[in-house]
A protein has these predicted regions:
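Gly/serine-rich nucleotide phosphate-binding loop at the start of the catalytic core
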Residues: 51
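Extended, solvent-exposed polar beta/coil surface segments
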Residues: 1-2, 32-35, 195
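Non-catalytic, mobile gating and regulatory segments of ester bond hydrolases
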Residues: 1-30
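Generic structural signal for hydrophobic core residues of well-folded globular domains
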Residues: 43, 64, 68, 104-108, ...
């Protein structure tokens, strides 16, 4: 009699503790909160774009830019982010660009203030390559709108708008573009840029580069179902790019209008497991239970950095995140409001200007840092 077999996969988990040197977790958490608040402010005054995904990406984005290369972060100079030998960052989940816009503004403002206060040119960034807080005004605005918005509203000489005189207001489309600071190339919509990241890693290997530069790409689980992502799985292994390629997956099981596992993929298909999809292709897969926890993120980055360079498997970190994450939330609640808006319901920015939910988010920031936003409690503004 002929024999026909069925096949199932079983995962083998090798958990180990990672010893971390002293690092300033509070500083990273503070930058994450400022970044999250900035991206939500952009959405509030534009009522468009994306909300939950960028928030979920925040700890990944902050850690990659600020923990330094010894802990597995990027080697780069914010003042000259396009230096050819910098590590390469790619926000492959392009619609999550508000988190990078926000962080780059925070970093840009820090250097700007330092330069203004000291006059020391070591703090002077190339403003044509970097972002400043004034660029918030350029979020999802046309070129003409950016050029005239201040003069039409009598704000050209307002003290808060003086940065516009440096090089104008930059347009921020809402998706990662090739001109964006550390983002290496235009990643396009979700599911496309991840293949470009693998190609970048292959390029540096082909020309005989050392372990540097490394290629770091951030993407979500829904986009990893794309055809480009399947090609990435095979080509990165075939090209043996090793630890040069480090993919950071934000796994929150939430897309635009449904869950992936349990929604698009019905729950009875229990062999559909994200981690298995990468281990079965030969990747070196790392996981953490909470990639919105900075200590876990830094530990994973350090573990990837410490991997033997002779191991030529490309690396991916599958970290569970919360779509709609908020650093001021308490047990799934936003103080002063109620249930936190998470999962696919948080995907678009659909809140009215100065809505109750936005005001509640802002109040957690105010309470944490002892500040007060102007006008948030006065309802929607009636002009620009």
């Amino acid at each position: 009699m002929p024999i026909v077999s069925t096949v199932t996969l079983s995962s083998v988990l090798d958990a180990r503790e990672v010893t971390l040197p002293n690092f300033d977790k509070q500083y990273l958490d503070d930058v994450s909160f400022v970044t999250a608040m900035t991206l939500v402010l952009m959405g509030n005054y534009c009522q468009t774009g994306h909300f939950g995904g960028p928030l979920a990406y925040t700890p990944y984005t902050v850690a990659s830019h600020l923990i330094g290369p010894d802990l597995g972060g990027l080697k780069y100079d914010y003042r000259r982010p396009k230096h050819p030998y910098s590590d390469k960052f790619m926000l492959a989940g392009g619609h999550n660009a508000p988190v990078t816009y926000a962080l780059w503004m925070v970093l840009g403002e820090a250097l700007y203030r330092k330069y203004e206060n000291t006059g020391n040119k070591k703090y002077l960034a190339d403003y044509d390559q970097t972002l400043l807080p004034i660029d918030c005004i350029g979020f999802r605005r046309s070129k003409r709108g950016r050029e005239t918005i201040l003069s039409e509203n009598g704000l050209s000489d307002h003290p808060a708008m003086q940065q516009a005189k440096i090089r104008g207001i930059r347009a921020l489309s809402g998706h990662s573009e090739s001109t964006d600071v550390t983002n290496d190339v235009n990643g396009g919509p979700s599911g496309i840029g991840i293949a470009t990241a693998a190609g970048k890693a292959t390029f540096w290997d082909i020309i005989g580069a050392s372990d540097s530069p490394k290629i770091m790409a951030v993407e979500g689980e829904f986009a990893m179902t794309s055809g480009h992502s399947q090609e990435t799985k095979t080509q990165a292994v075939a090209q043996q790019v090793g630890k040069r390629l480090r993919v950071l997956m934000s796994y929150n099981n939430a897309g635009i209008d449904d869950e992936l596992v349990g929604g698009v993929i019905q729950p009875q298909y229990d062999s559909y497991r994200i981690v298995d999809q990468w281990t079965s292709y030969g990747w070196n897969v790392f996981t953490v239970d909470d990639a919105n926890d900075m200590e876990q993120v830094v530990a994973a980055f350090k573990a990837m950095e410490d991997t033997d360079p002779s191991d030529r498997r490309p690396m991916i970190l599958v970290g569970k995140t919360t779509k709609g994450w908020w650093p001021g939330a308490e047990n799934g609640q936003i103080p002063g409001y109620g249930n936190q808006i998470t999962s696919y319901k948080s995907h678009p920015y659909t809140f009215a200007m100065n809505s109750d939910y936005f005001a509640a988010l802002a109040s957690t920031f105010e309470n944490r840092y002892g500040v007060k936003f102007k006008g948030i409690g006065d309802g929607a503004i009636t002009d620009e």
